[in-house]
Curated annotation (Swiss-Prot):
PANTHER family cross-referenced by the UniProt entry: D-AMINO ACID DEHYDROGENASE, SARCOSINE DEHYDROGENASE-RELATED
UniProt similarity note: Belongs to the DadA oxidoreductase family.
InterPro entries: DadA, FAD-dep_OxRdtase, FAD/NAD-bd_sf
Pathway(s) annotated for this protein in UniProt: Amino-acid degradation; D-alanine degradation; NH(3) and pyruvate from D-alanine: step 1/1
Gene name tied to this protein: dadA
GO cellular component, one term: plasma membrane
Protein name (Swiss-Prot/TrEMBL): D-amino acid dehydrogenase
Organism (species): Stenotrophomonas maltophilia (strain K279a)
Length: 434
């Protein structure tokens, strides 16, 4: 049975790997000249299985008003003429309650913890290397209010059996010795089972292993639309030519909604623009040990072999990929405060990418109203964290195997209005130019 996977980021590539392991004939299509050249290219590098949290949280609406006037605000909204932007923001606001936050975080932790197990199993099986470290994540709190607010997260972590430690200043320094000079830290939440690693390196190496296993990758090819007949996809238009298969997987990140919208599916995925700096390490003893998350700025500082990756922030600004000097200054501020002697900012590489975010934080994985069309998208800032679990979960669904975790609340049907596909024949669904 032939499957076309649309997209070769970390989500598309892990999907291809697990589908091939399940016995499918797999072809991956992407417009880029290679894998992991968009959102997966230079993300924060954190595998934050325990830290997993939705952006839609209690208190965010009130904070967002204050952030409008802050230079280094973690979240920025740039209003445009896109109705999808306003619809997405409204849905996000509706998820900023204690009840919805608990439901959404529990779903995300379920997938993230499963993904950790899948990644560990994959590493043991194929020995893939990606500058990975298994030294945990430390979330820094600069105010007592931030520390107190972590209580709800801790409750959910305990519910799922995720190990954690609440650290005082001495505990922070023990975990991350290079932070001994930093004043004003009131505490931290440490998640010892979290990991780090270079997402792009992982994806490129896994793509090569996919090829060795028989997966075909076709690059520099534009996906221009879908065709369907009744409740089945009959083919995908690639550079204007129709390509047929038995099943199709949409793993196009922020561009997924544009492809499926003409099918009558309103997929609530919107790009959250993020930024990163990558700088060479100058003094290993003064660099991070693993991943640090600065709660005040929502910025992560991650250690690779000989590099520091600083990433974070979220802009609701559509598909704008311009680089903001103001955002660069925020990243430089955080890394200079925490690790002033750790890396060379004068040689830093500045990057931006679009994370495909749902308003509730949970990705959209699984079946659709079309019998042979599947989704694997909407992971937001946690695509790298959830990639292996999402790929394995999808392959199990498509193989009619019982997934190892609950399927509750993970597919598009949780949004309610997608139960019926349009019953038109031989219609072409055109994907706008990207």
């Amino acid at each position: 049975m032939r499957v076309l996977v649309l997209g070769s980021g970390v989500i598309g590539t892990t999907s291809a790997w697990y589908l091939r392991q399940a016995g499918f004939e797999v072809t991956v299509i992407d417009r880029q000249p290679g894998p992991a050249l968009e959102t997966s290219f230079a993300n924060a590098g954190q595998l934050s299985f325990g830290y997993t949290s939705p952006w839609a949280a209690p208190g965010v609406p009130k904070k967002a008003i204050g952030w409008l006037f802050e230079k280094h605000a973690p979240l920025a909204i740039k209003p445009g003429m896109d109705l999808a932007q306003y619809r997405w923001l409204w849905q996000m606001l509706r998820n900023c309650t204690h009840e919805r936050y608990a439901i959404n975080k529990a779903r995300m932790v379920r997938m993230s913890e499963y993904s950790r197990d899948c990644l560990n199993e994959l590493r043991a099986q194929i020995g893939i290397e990606f500058e990975g470290r298994d030294l945990g994540t430390t979330q820094l709190f600069r105010t007592q209010q931030q520390l107190d607010a972590s209580a709800q997260d801790i409750e959910i972590l305990a519910q799922y059996g995720v190990p954690y430690e609440v650290l005082d200043r001495a505990g922070i320094i023990q975990a991350e010795p290079a932070l001994a000079h930093v004043d004003g830290l009131v505490g931290a939440l440490r998640l010892p089972r979290d990991q780090t690693g270079d997402c792009q390196l992982f994806t490129r190496r896994l793509a090569q292993m996919c090829v060795d296993a028989g997966v075909e990758f076709r690059f520099d090819q534009d996906i221009t639309g879908l065709e369907f007949d009744g409740d089945r996809i009959t083919g995908v238009r690639i550079d204007g030519k129709l390509e047929t298969a038995d099943r199709f997987v949409v793993a196009l990140g922020s561009y997924s909604p544009a492809l499926v919208a003409p099918l009558g599916m309103r997929l609530p995925v919107y790009p959250l623009k993020g930024y990163s700096l990558t700088l060479p390490i100058t003094d290993p003893a003064m660099a991070p040990t693993s991943t640090i998350l600065d709660e005040s700025y929502k910025v992560a500082v991650t250690r690779f072999d000989d590099r520091i990756r600083v990433g974070g922030m979220a802009e609701v600004a559509g598909f704008d990929l311009s680089l903001s000097q103001r955002r660069r200054e925020t990243l430089e501020l955080v890394v200079s405060d925490l690790y002033p002697k750790g890396g060379d900012l004068s040689r830093a590489q500045f990057w931006t990418g679009l994370r495909p975010a749902t308003p509730d934080g949970t990705p959209v994985i699984g079946a659709t109203p079309f019998r042979n069309l599947y989704l694997n998208t909407g992971h937001g800032t946690l695509g790298w964290t959830m990639a292996c679990g999402s790929g394995r979960y999808l392959a199990d669904l498509m193989s009619a195997r019982q997934p190892q975790i609950s399927t509750e609340g993970l597919d598009i049907f949780r949004y309610g209005q997608y139960g019926h596909a349009p019953q038109q024949e031989n219609r072409t669904c055109v994907l706008p130019a990207r």
